[in-house]
A protein has these predicted regions:
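Enzymes that bind and transform nitrogen-containing heteroaromatic metabolites
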Residues: 1-194
């Protein structure tokens, strides 16, 4: 929500994010598309020869923008995420085995790394394991949206919660939520902090 009353909370959120010293930020598909202007991948009809498994592109960046995109729709121009006020970050896509080969080929051509985490649906624990194994990432900030936040919580892949609340409401049904169950997760799962 972009309101004047939420501006201070937004600044506090950025301060907390910086203070946690994580080298990786993780976002869901919709949030990532907002960051890159809604760009959608234009895929070739044929994938060509795409080897099985993960793809680790060469990258000088020591920060990582991790994007969960199991459908294979985000239109990256190259393998670096750039945003004023943040360090350049190497892009890592989290896909599943069912993500189209054409999209994997598209990512390879642009130097975007990707990992496969799950057969038909996202396996958050496998994603976290691979991010640690391949890039030495020990802490990941799962920054939204609500569906990816809840998916990590429900699968037991989140061990800490930092939540900033702003004194603002808009009453819109399209407003982004903090937690939202994915239709792919068939059963709700209660969660509490310990």
């Amino acid at each position: 929500m972009r309101t004047e009353s939420a501006a201070e909370a937004s600044e506090q959120y950025a301060d907390i994010r910086s203070g946690l010293h994580a080298r990786a930020w993780l976002y869901g598909t919709s949030t990532t598309r907002e960051f890159i202007g809604g760009s959608k991948a234009v895929l070739k009809e044929r994938a060509g020869n795409v080897p099985d498994g993960d793809f680790i592109a060469e990258a000088p960046e020591k920060f990582y923008f991790v994007s969960v995109d199991t459908e294979g729709i985000i239109g990256w121009q190259d393998g670096t995420f750039r945003k004023e006020g943040r360090p350049d970050a190497h892009v890592i896509e989290v896909l599943t085995e069912k993500t189209p080969l054409q999209y994997r080929s598209y990512l390879r051509e642009r130097g975007v790394s990707y990992i496969l985490a799950g057969k038909d649906s996202l396996d958050c624990r496998e994603a976290v394991r691979k991010l640690g194994e391949y890039w030495g990432i020990e802490a990941i900030l799962v920054c939204g949206g609500g569906t990816i936040n809840w998916t990590f919580v429900q699968q037991g892949a989140a061990d800490e919660l930092s939540l900033v609340l702003a004194p603002a409401a808009d009453g819109e049904s399209e407003t982004v939520t903090v937690f939202e169950r994915s239709p792919l997760l068939l059963r709700p799962c209660p969660w509490s902090l310990h």
